[in-house]
Amino acid sequence: MNRKLSREKAMELLFGMTLSKDTMEDAVEAFVENYEGDIKEIDLTYVKQVLIGVNNNKEAIDKVIQENLHNWKIERISKVNLSILRIATYELLYDKEVPRGVAINEALEITRRYSDEKSVSFINGVLDKIKQD
């Protein structure tokens, strides 16, 4: 199983759930049914753990993100970038199995694929501040 790919799919699902208001169960079920690659490459247990973790700690995660924004409001962050920040912040604060550097580097790699270079710098700055707290 590929953790990097699983993290990316967790971000896609979290982003989709933000837009559609689907439940995690519905989103994961639809993902599994429609995934065109080898589903065995995805660690669905990890994906669900991340989605549940972000959902269960969303207020605390958003508070930490907001506290580490400089002259920004969390509402101004694009949904894609916010999904990336939420997953990385969840990993930094709650998932002790993921090294902090890995959580940040993976978030930046996902940002490079789904956003632009300004977003990479922005997310790196926010996560670096969170890591230091």
UniProtKB/Swiss-Prot annotation:
Query: What's this protein's name?
Result: Transcription antitermination protein NusB
The record's Gene Ontology cellular component field reads:
cytosol
Q: Does the keyword RNA-binding apply?
A: yes
Describe the family membership recorded for this protein in Swiss-Prot or TrEMBL: Belongs to the NusB family.
Its biological purpose is as follows: Involved in transcription antitermination. Required for transcription of ribosomal RNA (rRNA) genes. Binds specifically to the boxA antiterminator sequence of the ribosomal RNA (rrn) operons.
Which Pfam families did the record assign? NusB
The answer to whether keyword Transcription regulation applies is yes
What NCBIfam families has UniProt attached to this entry? nusB
In Gene Ontology terms, what is one molecular function of this protein? RNA binding
Question: What biological processes does GO assign it?
Answer: DNA-templated transcription termination; transcription antitermination
Keyword set, alphabetical order: RNA-binding, Transcription, Transcription antitermination, Transcription regulation
